[in-house]
């Protein structure tokens, strides 16, 4: 089977009149982080990155030795995580780090030393763990780091509105002034009409897939939809003279704790439960490339007492609702997905520090 693209960033709008049991509730004033690509959500702006799935996999495979099931009933999102639809094999080894063990200060130092040596990075979440809690059992951790340039350095275009906004935002791309030849830095996946198209910005090992759509489906369904449409498309997949491209600069920094997974006694364990289920993302996209840093951690606790439950020239303009995926070129699945509807939530502030 052909492996997934190396880095995909997807921006999706997932609004629906009817929501399934695995729908994740969210506020409407921020970007929502999702634990799995297949999660449904009421939040228009949302993002998924594969780091939390990696943490879940390590816990299930190396500590639980099987699926993670809760004594008081396993929620749909946990069932989806148990399917392990994203794995380390879908990433290049130099782009991620994972660790697990007893929750000790020695493990914390081991992780800090490892991510500094491998990525020259520090952690934003390890200090959120209470390393001296007497109920500590295990800590599982992962980091994903991507920093790449496109094969084409795109021009900075004039500011304009996004999705009928009042504010004007920065864009990069290719316009009629600088498109006098074919451009192999942009691969056309399909162009069905002025409201339904997708392209892939090329890097050496990764690509950025941009899909113009108003779809409310989950990221997994949308990614499958892209592949189906690309396979059926009979038009030119070369970005040719006369084609134009417009993409917004984006900065996103978010952190979440998946509380729906916390506080439930885990079956077939000695009274273990998830204390915290943390996930972060720092994402930056400009005219030269992508910077992405994401962490995830699960603190596993041991219950001491009962705890509370808790056709002519085509215009590839991404100035309206769109979805972005990041993936490695030789992999079959994306490791990042994002749906963008409200640009106020993604105001470009410069490179992620």
Language model: regions and residue ranges:
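Hydrophobic core
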Residues: 9, 13-17
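Positively charged n-region of N-terminal signal peptides that target proteins for export
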Residues: 1-4
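Hydrophobic-core positions in well-structured secondary-structure elements of globular domains
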Residues: 22-353
């Amino acid at each position: 089977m052909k492996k997934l693209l190396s880095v995909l960033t997807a921006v999706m709008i997932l609004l629906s009149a009817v929501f399934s049991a695995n729908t994740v509730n969210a506020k409407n004033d921020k970007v929502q982080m999702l634990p799995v690509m297949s999660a449904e959500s009421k939040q228009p702006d949302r993002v998924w990155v594969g780091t939390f799935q990696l943490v879940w996999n390590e816990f299930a495979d190396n500590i639980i030795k099987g699926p993670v099931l809760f004594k008081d009933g396993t929620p749909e999102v946990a069932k989806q995580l148990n399917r392990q639809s994203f794995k380390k094999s879908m990433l290049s080894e130099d782009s991620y780090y994972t660790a697990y063990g007893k929750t000790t200060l020695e493990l914390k130092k081991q992780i800090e030393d490892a991510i500094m040596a491998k990525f020259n990075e520090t952690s934003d979440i390890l200090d959120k763990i209470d390393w001296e809690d007497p109920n500590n059992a295990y800590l599982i951790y992962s980091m994903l780091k991507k920093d790449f340039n496109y094969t084409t350095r795109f021009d900075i275009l004039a500011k304009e509105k996004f999705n009928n906004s009042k504010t004007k935002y920065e864009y990069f791309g290719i316009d009629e002034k600088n498109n006098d030849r074919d451009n192999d830095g942009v691969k056309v996946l399909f162009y069905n009409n002025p409201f339904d198209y997708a392209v892939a910005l090329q890097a050496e090992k990764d690509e950025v897939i941009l899909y113009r759509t108003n779809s409310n489906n989950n990221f997994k369904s949308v990614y499958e939809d892209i592949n189906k449409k690309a396979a059926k498309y009979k038009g030119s997949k070369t970005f040719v003279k006369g084609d134009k491209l417009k993409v917004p600069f984006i900065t996103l920094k978010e952190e979440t704790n998946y509380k729906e997974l916390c506080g439930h006694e885990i079956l077939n364990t000695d009274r273990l439960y998830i204390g915290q289920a943390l996930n972060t993302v720092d994402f930056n996209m400009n005219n030269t490339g992508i910077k992405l840093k994401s962490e995830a951690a699960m603190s596993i606790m041991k219950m001491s007492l009962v705890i509370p439950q808790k056709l002519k020239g085509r215009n590839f303009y991404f100035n309206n609702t769109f979805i972005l995926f990041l993936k490695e070129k030789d992999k079959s699945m994306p490791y990042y997905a994002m749906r963008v509807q409200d640009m106020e939530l993604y105001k470009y502030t410069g490179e992620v520090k």
